[in-house]
Structures are given as C-alpha cells and as structure tokens.
Amino acid sequence: MQRVTSYLPAGTPSSHPTAQVKLPHDLRHLRRKLLHLENGEMVMLDLKDPVLFANGDLLVRDDGELIEILAADEKLFEIRGRDRTHLVELAWHLGNRHLAAQIEEDRIVILRDHVIRSMLQGLGATVLDIDEPFQPARGAYHSHGAHSHDQGHAAHDHGNEHKHDHGHDHVHGPGCDHDHDHDHGHHHDHKHD
C-alpha cells in the first residue's frame, strides 16, 4: 500500500494528479488516516502534523504520484440577504453562534440546520437548500497559515487570556482587559488517527 507523507497546496504549477479522494469539510482535517480513493485504491496518509486541507490540495505519494483532494457535495443552506449590509448582519448572527460558514460576496453557505433556517428567515433572509462542496472560512483560532493547526496556540500569546471549554486556551490582543470562560456550543475532537 502506498503512503503519503507530504502535500502541496492547490494550484501548484506543473502538478498533474493521477487519482482523487472526495471528502466532506469535517473529514479534511487530517494527520494519519487510511484514505479510499475514487479509483478504488487505498493509501495511508501519515503526516507529521495535522493539516486542514482545502479543495484542490494535493497529496504526494511515496512514488511521487499526486492525489487531488476534492470537496464532496454536502447538504447545505444558501443564504442571501436583501443587500450587502443585510448579508453582513446575517453573517454576524451566524458567527455569534460559532457556525462554520462559507462567506462569499453575495451569499453565505452553511450546513443545514432547521433551527438556524427559521432564525434566518425571521431576520428576512432567503434560505435555499443546495447540495455542493463546502469550504467554510477558517477560524482565527483554528488555522494559522494555509495548512496548519497549532494545537498549542502559542502564536496567540498577547496577554489578557481567557479560557474556552474545549481543551486549549485562547488570548486577546492589547486593549482587551478581561478574562472569561464560555461554552462554544460545539465540541472539537482533537484526536487524530
């Protein structure tokens, strides 16, 4: 069985993948995993550190062949506002609930949640069911750089710390003079195969 121990970002010049693997957004945060390719082959992904992969990123097999990561279609909501200001307000409400969101110029895309749909419609949004690949924005605390996930979060250390209930600390920058604990309303599973 071939192994993968390195990767290249999407759009790398002169890259011609010979295989593909489709993964939904929540399965694209990887370090070590047996991957089932679209052509029926299997490869063992074995990276030094966890990586949050995006659509089009490339895995490099031990033999030099490339495997393209494709974002799988998912059941989503497409959210549109009356105008850009309204769309920004809707984005604020979604962010306040810590929801993964793909934010585009004229729409926001989220995973389907009928409670959230009711809230958005109550705020005047148009909400449509769609099925397409999902590439949510990477959170400020959960992706430092294009492909890393710093478990220690040392890059944040600017003082004025507050604690979250999901296993690691985050800190605020200068001018934020408070400490607090709060529940995100969701869980992060930092176990890696």
Curated annotation (Swiss-Prot):
Keywords: Chaperone, Cytoplasm, Nickel. Coiled coil: none annotated. Residues 147-193 have a biased composition (Basic and acidic residues). InterPro entries: UreE, UreE_C_dom, UreE_N, UreE_N_sf. GO terms for biological process: protein folding; protein-containing complex assembly; urea metabolic process. One of its GO terms (molecular function) is unfolded protein binding. One of its GO terms (cellular component) is cytoplasm. It is found in: Cytoplasm. Residues 138-193 are annotated as: Disordered. SMART domains: UreE_N (SM00988). Involved in urease metallocenter assembly. Binds nickel. Probably functions as a nickel donor during metallocenter assembly. Belongs to the UreE family. This is Urease accessory protein UreE.
